Amino acid sequence: MKKFKIRKLMARVLALALVFSTFFMVSKVDANAASYNLMETYGAKYGYSGNCVHTHMLRDSRIVNAIKKDSNIVTLGNEMKPDYLLGSRQATLISVDEAKRLGYYIPSNYKERYVPKIDFRTVDEAVKICYENGLKMRGHTLVWHSQTPTWLFRENYSGNGRFVNTATMDARLEFYVKSVMGHFYSGKYGSTLVYWDVCNETLHAQNSGWEAVYGSNKTNAVYVKKAFNYAYQVLEQYKLTNSVKLFYNDYNTYMEVNDVIKLVNYINQGKKVCAGVGMQSHLGTGFPSVDYYTNALNSFLRAGFEVQITELDITNKGDYDLNNYAYRLFKNINAAKKNGGNISCITWWGPSDAETWIRNEKPLIWSNIGVAKPAYDEVVKAFTETFGNPGSFTPQPTITPQPTPTPSGQT
């Protein structure tokens, strides 16, 4: 009887020990998986780990602090687009003299008496908050066929006017690009802006004002080349060519690799002003395949382009589906980086499933701001399996722009 009780007691002890040891091992695995954040891994190795935000989010210090754990750069979802800076419905016109007093850039070939007023108030607030919190920002975007007021392309800045000629539009384009960029780099917080999506989705423009004025040759789009040249001239003026970079940004780039390469090479004919490609990455576990996507990534790298993953989200059929795809995707991205690929930034398009433009799809690796999903651990695991744990590799240094205007000033 005593032997039976002893054996029974020992069995319970062993069972209890097994439970505790299993719990300990699971806890240890979970702890290891969650012990590193995106800044310690991707931010350190690639230089920048980013996210998409809106100004109202930045006003909440709790949200900012949560975002900073995984990001050192942000992209404003809407507030820097032409519709938001210029107003979409009708132009608020001011005289050229008043524009000069406000610090706008007026090209010497600008023949009109008025320019549209640019409303910087919201974006200035966002840039200031980022500056105060040590966050950098991507300028998104200067030239786009969408979310750009139609009156910008028409006579007298009127929605009912005829389309202007190319000479007039050239002057308007130079006015806008240089006024927007110059506004930031002439101010206190200019060092916040380190990248610009100068032109967005040109290959997908249809029936736009840009095409109405300049024609529809997408891989040799004259206005795109001019926009990059104007933007680069601003960098030259403020001595920022070594610390701020300009990108062409587009979606479905894996389906249009050759056209993207042709366009960027055209932009850089005569002088390299475009650093490379922003690969918008609105992906799905059903399409594109991981191999299809990374074949495009490697094609851009072989073409000599710097590549940034700019708008990443992944539609999926559930956590298991997302976990598997995210792990394989980042294994391939990290392999490209390890093989010497010039990939300098990865930006998720939203801080959580609750703040995404894709409703009911749960395409991100956070369920709520600061609350990681299992896919987050898979993304980190893909990193540590490739590069090792933080501390075992050399972090990628980043450069803070120090805008210094040259004597050329503004006309």
Curated annotation (Swiss-Prot):
Belongs to the glycosyl hydrolase 10 (cellulase F) family. Its EC number is 3.2.1.8. One of its GO terms (molecular function) is endo-1,4-beta-xylanase activity. The active site is at E201, E311. Transmembrane segments: none annotated. It is an enzyme of class 3 (hydrolase). Pathway: Glycan degradation; xylan degradation. The gene is xynA. This is Endo-1,4-beta-xylanase A. It catalyses: Endohydrolysis of (1->4)-beta-D-xylosidic linkages in xylans. Residues 387-411 are annotated as: Disordered. InterPro entries: GH10, GH10_AS, GH10_dom, Glycoside_hydrolase_SF. Residues 398-411 have a biased composition (Pro residues).
